[in-house]
Amino acid sequence: MEANHQRNDLGLVALTMLAQYHNISLNPEEIKHKFDLDGKGLSLTSWLLAAKSLALKAKHIKKEISRLHLVNLPALVWQDNGKHFLLVKVDTDNNRYLTYNLEQDAPQILSQDEFEACYQGQLILVTSRASVVGQLAKFDFTWFIPAVIKYRKIFLETLIVSIFLQIFALITPLFFQVVMDKVLVHRGFSTLNIITVALAIVIIFEIVLSGLRTYVFSHSTSRIDVELGAKLFRHLLSLPISYFENRRVGDTVARVRELDQIRNFLTGQALTSVLDLLFSFIFFAVMWYYSPKLTLVILGSLPCYILWSIFISPILRRRLDDKFARSADNQAFLVESVTAINMIKAMAVAPQMTDTWDKQLASYVSSSFRVTVLATIGQQGVQLIQKTVMVINLWLGAHLVISGDLSIGQLIAFNMLSGQVIAPVIRLAQLWQDFQQVGISVTRLGDVLNSPTEQYQGKLSLPEIKGDISFKNIRFRYKPDAPTILNNVNLEIRQGEVIGIVGRSGSGKSTLTKLLQRFYIPENGQVLIDGHDLALADPNWLRRQIGVVLQDNVLLNRSIRENIALSDPGMPMERVIYAAKLAGAHDFISELREGYNTIVGEQGAGLSGGQRQRIAIARALVNNPKILIFDEATSALDYQSEHIIMQNMQKICQGRTVILIAHRLSTVKNADRIIVMEKGEIVEQGKHHELLQNSNGLYSYLHQLQLN
């Protein structure tokens, strides 16, 4: 009745869903009590005030349909008649709108005409304060500005060295001018010797300072690289489970590898070329002093370089995008193939996999070749402009020398100075491909670094949990347009109780435990431990006190001891051995040559499936968690290993709340209570013998199937 009453106020329903989307928990009744004073539902003003009270940033705007694709979604479409709904996604290519019908509690895809019929032009944009801060700290090229400021002393030293290098570059042509116009004309050998020695000293200083600049610059950019790499890995491990479940492993790895492109760019010549380019104004002043006409030729060539780059850049970027997409596909396919090598060999499908690889590799090589061809065309275009300018300057300079407006020494000095000006321009033009590639890399890496992490700040780190668990009115789906996985689930689990959960595949058993670990926030309802809402709890605090054993567990390429004591490497050996004995793993570990120091191999490849499972159980028990989850934990064990664990089950369960998820009913028959699930709902619960008394029940049906 309460749910129906809340459903009548679609504004309150929308606020609840949007708050949970932003990982903010609320009590609908409390919001209704504070802001729905007349009992007629939340008005526009009260809705905005309620959102503000939840630390949400809400803004009411009027937006034309043609511009809806520009706003941050999901957003609330406000209707004067109270029939509000959520706008989740705008598909501009097909003119379709993914919405969420709050009345029917279901997603809907509307056509352009259908959406226009119900859209009144009013929209409420909602974001969390944390999201606003995150958007201000987005990863793009501006991310490097604080890093540059942090190492400003080093960059200032680099700038000073660059100034001296430019002074030396300015002096060298003057020496050549003196030699050509004075020494050769007057045959001044003593002056020649002095100039030669001075030039040698300048060259030595120039080489030393240039090397020093490169060293200092590379050292500072390497520090930035380390900071970025560390930030990337920390951020990657802080991302929610949903990020990894919605992306291919190879695609994520490919994005992380883009760090190499950024590293190469930072430690390359591009940034030093920019510094050299900044000093070109001084050279232009000296060149203008020599010959305004020749200087105008050089200045006239600069727009040609810029226009050529503007023409090439968009095409190059599209081809680089395509190249990255092909590379990511190859990376994903390679990771998938190596991971599934046992299946590939068992089914003898290597020829089919090879054929797919060959096609994908050919596509990547073709895409890479198109990038190379375009880059070559770009570089040759730059060379053409440079050679053309050189010919014009030679012709015009010769005329000026013949007419007496310029000496031979001045012409040579001018050409040397123009080379100092054009060289960084050409280097930058040639490095433009690298810059485009780095732009792509920053965008791809931004997909990782700009994805919101699980929020820890402001979350409650509560005292050690006791083990009381409550699921209240839980409704959950993995995606807005996906089917409902859990529907109106209510379950109370007392401290120290052993609960078995059974049901057909896809009934929502494992999803319950994922909500308990706070991998996801329910669409509706609350998950509480000891009366504390998990939406407000620190995920790390929670997960440290929950032991989980899955059907397929992953071991790291370390020793058995390190795998068991993964959460506390300094754990006493006695605790490790005790946990291994409880899990039935101590005997087989003792028989190994290296014992607990045996390296298990990548993902535990050096052990059998049953051995891996027992080590995983020991790993879950070693921290003495107050809540223990066995999700098909014994299904991969042989009967002897399962028998050992079931014998120890009383010790394992002592002093903790245990949730056993199993298809084998024999695993849960001794549980204090058995929960039977079907299509996301709890259909039966009771003890083993009580459930068998209902011959028409699902539990009896499953029990009969296993007996047969």
From Swiss-Prot:
Entry EC no(s): 7.4.2.5
GO cellular component: plasma membrane; type I protein secretion system complex
Transmembrane segments: 159-179, 192-212, 270-290, 296-316, 389-409
Domain ABC transmembrane type-1: 155-437
GO biological process: protein secretion by the type I secretion system; proteolysis
Keywords: ATP-binding, Cell inner membrane, Cell membrane, Membrane, Nucleotide-binding, Translocase, Transmembrane, Transmembrane helix, Transport
Residue stretches making up the Peptidase C39 domain: 1-126
Pfam families referenced in this protein's UniProt entry, alphabetically: ABC_membrane, ABC_tran, Peptidase_C39
UniProt cross-references to SMART domains, sorted A to Z: AAA
Residues where ATP binds: G503, R504, S505, G506, S507, G508, K509, S510
Domain ABC transporter: 469-704
GO molecular function: ABC-type transporter activity; ATP binding; ATP hydrolysis activity; ATPase-coupled lipid transmembrane transporter activity
PANTHER family registered for this protein in UniProt: ATP-BINDING CASSETTE SUB-FAMILY B, BLL6336 PROTEIN
Function text: Part of the ABC transporter complex LktBD involved in leukotoxin export. Transmembrane domains (TMD) form a pore in the inner membrane and the ATP-binding domain (NBD) is responsible for energy generation.
NCBIfam families, A to Z: type_I_sec_HlyB
Family: Belongs to the ABC transporter superfamily. Protein-1 exporter (TC 3.A.1.109) family.
Entry remark concerning the domains of this protein: In LktB the peptidase C39 domain, the ATP-binding domain (NBD) and the transmembrane domain (TMD) are fused.
Protein name, UniProt field: Leukotoxin translocation ATP-binding protein LktB
Species this protein is from: Mannheimia haemolytica
